[in-house]
From Swiss-Prot:
Family recorded in the similarity comment: Belongs to the WhiA family.
Described purpose of this protein according to its UniProt entry: Involved in cell division and chromosome segregation.
Pfam hit, one: WhiA_N
GO terms for MF: DNA binding
BP GO annotations: cell division; regulation of sporulation
Protein name as catalogued: Probable cell division protein WhiA
Alphabetized InterPro entries for the sequence: Homing_endonucl, Sporu_reg_WhiA_N_dom, Sporulation_regulator_WhiA, Sporulation_regulator_WhiA_C, WhiA_LAGLIDADG_dom
Highest taxon above the source species: Bacteria
Key words, A-Z: Cell cycle, Cell division, DNA-binding
Amino acid sequence: MAMTTEVKDELSRLVVKSVSARRAEVTSLLRFAGGLHIVAGRVVVEAEVDLGSIARRLRKDIFDLYGYSAVVHVLSASGIRKNTRYVLRVANDGEALARQTGLLDMRGRPVRGLPAQVVGGSIGDAEAAWRGAFLAHGSLTEPGRSSALEVSCPGPEAALALVGAARRLGVGAKAREVRGADRVVVRDGEAIGALLTRMGAQDTRLVWEERRMRREVRATANRLANFDDANLRRSARAAVAAAARVERALEILGDTVPDHLASAGKLRVEHRQASLEELGRLADPPMTKDAVAGRIRRLLSMADRKAKVEGIPDTESAVTPDLLEDA
């Protein structure tokens, strides 16, 4: 998940001047990274993230925008927890923060998706919503056949809100339920690059695009190599089949075969892997490849006509599956 860390590190250092966008990012990050809890009758806002820089950014924005202090607890890696986690908690002013960020509605009920002011906000707010969601629970895989940018969502309503925000940014995203968990996925390479830029991870996008291009170049080279191999195999089989038919033609015609056709046929039999152009150079006197092809074609046609009249196997009978398999 190296690319994921690179994106989150860059986004956590991004300077955003728009107050509206900063509010949208805080709201989205809180919605996707944690939730609301009732502790001793009070609403507590929590968010769990995987980088200290994200926790510090969120704590600073909450204080700058809303004036509330947050406490960050560090959960060290141990047991089933593979990596260090950071839990930000606003306890004393949790309900006030939840109402101001739109996590609670006017009646004090939790908002299941994203608040209306974020969903219906500006393009900058839509970018900030994606930035907050990615900082909370996003991942970016290495470029390849199964490359994807994903965000794990707290519920289907939040997933649909994120899909809508992506649509406003001109990015195609899909909401999916995987093993009981809601996710929003972007798979198209161009769309992933565009979304990284929209969120503010331009430097990481350049790295990701470079790796993507290198992989595509390697894939193209492999396809061309496979194509060349297939062409060589087809050419080899065609040459073996042609030589077998010519041998049968010479058997059918015997002494009745014209000398100029016989010489072209013998060249084909003696040099089975040679191209028509090479056979032309080997002829005495030399011929063009079209002249060689024409003589071999007439030789086969003459032999097939005689075989039909006499009721014997024609030149095609010499081309057996075993013969082609060995080619």
